């Protein structure tokens, strides 16, 4: 699927864009249209937990409830399947004790726990807000490989330009209320943006020349 990196200076609405896609916030105008039965996983920049969980409960048990809220037999089968995969992901993110209480975690550990839950969710679309925050180099390299092999669509906000360049195949730039899209990685985006700005300057120069001629005509 597409792996889209969302970039722009702070305050331009990158995180808000992810929240709108996730359905956490509503648009002031217009509509966001999603296909039916699409599963979306959202990693906020600062995760908030609605109650006390152990790491296992949040990453595995809550995941099972989302997938099959009513069927106990199916839930047990899915839980058995997810447990092994969850342990692999958690281990890669630096966790060894799946019974640990999340309320005792640091902010960085909470972010990694929320990331693990997103990656395990089997979603069609991953929305990740600064996923490499609090990750060391080994964890970042592992996440890069995971996302490259991920079959769904990815929309990601990150200030890690190197990670962005390696993972994403499309760039969406939020700039002064506009969204510019580029079918390329970050390196290609820099080149295409430079071309767009050069073209804009050329157009501005042409408009300025027209205005100068108008002024000259008025002064005759």
Regions found by a protein language model. Name each.
Residues 1-205:
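ABC ATP-binding cassette signature C-motif
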Residues 205-220:
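Short cytosolic helices in intracellular loops of multi-pass membrane proteins
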């Amino acid at each position: 699927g597409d792996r889209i990196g969302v970039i722009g200076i702070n305050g331009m609405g990158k995180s808000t864009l992810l929240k709108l896609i996730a359905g956490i916030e509503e648009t002031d105008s217009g509509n966001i249209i999603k296909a039916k039965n699409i599963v979306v996983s959202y990693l906020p920049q600062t995760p908030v937990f609605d109650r006390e969980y152990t790491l296992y409960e949040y990453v595995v048990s809550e995941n099972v409830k989302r997938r099959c809220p009513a069927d106990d037999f199916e839930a047990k089968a899915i839980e058995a399947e997810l447990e092994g995969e969850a342990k692999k992901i958690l281990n890669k993110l630096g966790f060894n004790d799946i019974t640990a209480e999340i309320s005792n975690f640091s902010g960085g550990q909470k972010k990694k726990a929320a990331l693990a839950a997103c990656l395990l969710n089997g979603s069609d679309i991953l929305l990740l807000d600064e996923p490499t925050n609090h990750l060391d180099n080994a964890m970042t390299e592992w996440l890069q490989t995971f996302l490259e092999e991920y079959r769904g669509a990815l929309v990601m906000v990150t200030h890690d330009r190197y990670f962005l360049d390696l993972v994403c195949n499309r760039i969406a730039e939020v700039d002064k209320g506009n969204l510019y899209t580029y079918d390329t990685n970050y390196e290609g985006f820099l080149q295409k943006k430079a071309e767009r700005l050069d073209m804009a300057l050329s157009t501005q120069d042409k408009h300025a020349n027209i205005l100068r001629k108008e002024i000259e005509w008025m002064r005759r």
